[in-house]
Amino acid sequence: MSIIELQDVHVTFHERHNTVEAVRGVSLTIEQGEIFGIVGFSGAGKSTLVRTINLLERPTQGRVLIDGSDITGATGDELRKLRRNIGFVFQSFNLIDNITVGANIVFALKAGGVDKAAWHDRAVELLKLVGLDSKIDSYPSSLSGGQKQRVAIARALANNPEILLCDEATSALDLETTEEILALLKRINVELGITIVFITHQLDVAKQIFDHVAVMENGVIVEQGETFDVFSAPKHPTTKSLVDRYLGIAIPPQLVPSLPAGTIVELRYRGDGALEPLISDVTRKYGVSINVLHGDVEYFGPKPIGTLIVLIDGPAEALAAALDTLKAHVYSYRELNRERLARPAYGDGQQGEE
């Protein structure tokens, strides 16, 4: 059952000398209880779009439905009630620095109309949920970035929302802390059944927790679907660029001059398939030599996407047949230009790309 539906949503900003269309005709359906990701490069319109869900940005055109009800025109008490049902976690934490951690939680409880007698117990409960109940009397300035974000998550959950919006909630954190925050959000999703909408430019985040994903570029959704399907077989150039930047592997430049003769090929496979038997079969069948120069595997949920760079050599006819066979059995095949292999991978394009 869908909990969020955006129907042909546009957001236009009118500046003094020009008009900016930040979101252009976006339609999305987000199911109850899922973690839905919106990814894209900076300036794609992700933050503006996610803010239409709780009307921090009101659509210029189109409709926003929550639990099947059109909330686009909500104002006053109706809008305040709506926003209590939708928590928001910001990149910059947005904690109040001159009050304690506990008081930051109480601030949200008070705004949500919770009875004063319940404030302390609810604050303790929320801080226990995020593993920070011992910090209830501490001030935000004494906390690490990860701890501040945990407090921000606890505060966003203060009024038992059905939906949690996360705007680049991990982009200011280091890798280890990011993984801890993602694990916390996944646990909250599972244990509390909260629907999470998470925007990011980091595919490392997307691969760990998103059930479904939409890719944005220039205010438009250019591709969407199950996370593994979108990133294992990208169709739009923006999605392909995101994937290539993330999955790209480079041959160390110092090795390039010493590479023997042959054709250098990048192969990618997905799912449960593996390239090792294929490479052995091709070597045996066609009498060519195949040397693995580099390889990596990334998991999107439980499913792998693997990349290998191999050097293949042999008689011309056998080599052509071997390359055709490899091409037919992988989802991505690219011959690399030896003269460009010293370039950084996926900077201005793929390393060694023709």
Language-model segments: what does each one mean?
Residues E15-H17, I71-G87, A111, K116-A117, ...:
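ABC ATPase NBD coupling module
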Residues S138-S141, N159:
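Conserved signature/switch motifs of ABC ATPase nucleotide-binding domains
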Residues S69-D70, V106, K110, A117-S134:
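Conserved ABC ATPase "signature" region
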Residues L164-D167:
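Catalytic Walker B motif of ABC-type/P-loop ATPase nucleotide-binding domains
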Residues N54:
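Helix-to-loop junction immediately C-terminal to a conserved catalytic motif
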Residues I99-F107:
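Short coil-to-helix segment of the ABC ATPase nucleotide-binding domain corresponding to the Q-loop/switch region
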Residues Q224-G225, A233:
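ABC ATPase "signature
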